[in-house]
């Protein structure tokens, strides 16, 4: 059983390794994937994971081996902008930066939002998707910006942005971690089933 996480982002890789059980060996592959244009973050990610799986399968001589391919996607959904930018956050971030996004939201009478992260895993037959959601608000940039908009996202009922938190502080709150817990449970169960077959 081989597990591949598709990412070229070193921060995501580092975070994934901190969260993953050492019992599972994960290979990281960097594949440039086209994303479909859609508002549904799960739909986008499921399309992405199938594309990645097919690319990896074509590159491998052993077509019959059991492989699990994982992709992730994240969105920031701003209430007063009818949940825009959602899955298009990386493009908004690239165009405006964190400060620009915070400036746009500061002109609204409501700065609430929610962040969603999805992991999708595909084994060539079935796609399984896992979603984590964290409610919060957009604030002026504070802290580091290691992950896109961390320095402007302040979780509900807290006074720190993700950018001001340590890894441990952020972990239980982040939508990525919430989705990851579900993904890990699924992979551990698949790993047990796979080992019982041999």
From Swiss-Prot:
Which protein, by its recorded name, is this? Inosine triphosphate pyrophosphatase
Q: Which InterPro entries match?
A: ITPase, ITPase-like_fam, RdgB/HAM1
Q: Record keywords: Magnesium included?
A: yes
Family membership noted in the UniProt record: Belongs to the HAM1 NTPase family.
Which Pfam families does the UniProt entry name for this protein?
Answer: Ham1p_like
Q: Which organism is it from?
A: Plasmodium falciparum (isolate 3D7)
Q: Which HAMAP family match?
A: HAM1_NTPase (MF_03148)
The entry's cellular-component GO terms read: cytoplasm
Note the Gene3D superfamilies from the entry: 3.90.950.10
Q: Where does ITP bind?
A: 7-12, 48, 73-74, 90, 147-150, 170, 175-176
* Domain of life where this protein originates: Eukaryota
Q: What is the lineage of its organism?
A: Eukaryota, Sar, Alveolata, Apicomplexa, Aconoidasida
Q: What is its biological role? A: Pyrophosphatase that hydrolyzes non-canonical purine nucleotides such as inosine triphosphate (ITP), deoxyinosine triphosphate (dITP) or xanthosine 5'-triphosphate (XTP) to their respective monophosphate derivatives. The enzyme does not distinguish between the deoxy- and ribose forms. Probably excludes non-canonical purines from RNA and DNA precursor pools, thus preventing their incorporation into RNA and DNA and avoiding chromosomal lesions.
Tell me the subunit arrangement.
Homodimer.
- PANTHER family assigned: INOSINE TRIPHOSPHATE PYROPHOSPHATASE, INOSINE TRIPHOSPHATE PYROPHOSPHATASE/HAM1 PROTEIN
Q: What is its EC number?
A: 3.6.1.66
SUPFAM superfamilies, per the entry: ITPase-like
Q: Which GO terms describe its biological process?
A: deoxyribonucleoside triphosphate catabolic process; nucleoside triphosphate catabolic process; nucleotide metabolic process
Question: For this protein, what reaction is catalysed?
Answer: ITP + H2O = IMP + diphosphate + H(+); dITP + H2O = dIMP + diphosphate + H(+); XTP + H2O = XMP + diphosphate + H(+)
Details of cofactor binding: Binds 1 divalent metal cation per subunit; can use either Mg(2+) or Mn(2+).
Ordered alphabetically, the record's keywords are: Cytoplasm, Hydrolase, Magnesium, Manganese, Metal-binding, Nucleotide metabolism, Nucleotide-binding
Q: What class of enzyme is it?
A: hydrolase
């Amino acid at each position: 059983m081989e597990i591949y996480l598709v990412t070229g982002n070193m921060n995501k890789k580092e975070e994934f390794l901190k969260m993953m059980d050492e019992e599972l060996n994960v290979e990281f592959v960097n594949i440039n994937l086209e994303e479909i244009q859609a508002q549904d973050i799960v739909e986008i990610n499921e399309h992405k994971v199938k594309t990645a799986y097919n690319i990896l399968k074509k590159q491998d001589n052993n077509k019959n081996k059991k492989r699990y391919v994982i992709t992730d996607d994240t969105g920031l959904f701003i209430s007063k902008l009818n949940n825009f930018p959602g899955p298009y956050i990386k493009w908004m971030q690239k165009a405006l930066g964190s400060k620009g996004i915070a400036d746009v939201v500061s002109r609204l009478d409501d700065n609430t939002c929610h962040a969603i992260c999805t992991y999708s895993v595909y084994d060539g037959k079935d796609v399984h998707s896992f979603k984590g959601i964290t409610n919060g608000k957009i604030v002026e940039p504070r802290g580091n910006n290691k992950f896109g908009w961390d320095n402007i996202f302040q979780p509900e009922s807290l006074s720190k942005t993700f950018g001001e938190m340590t890894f441990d502080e952020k972990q239980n709150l982040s939508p990525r971690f919430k989705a990851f817990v579900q993904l890990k449970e699924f992979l551990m169960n698949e790993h047990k089933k796979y080992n019982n077959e041999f």
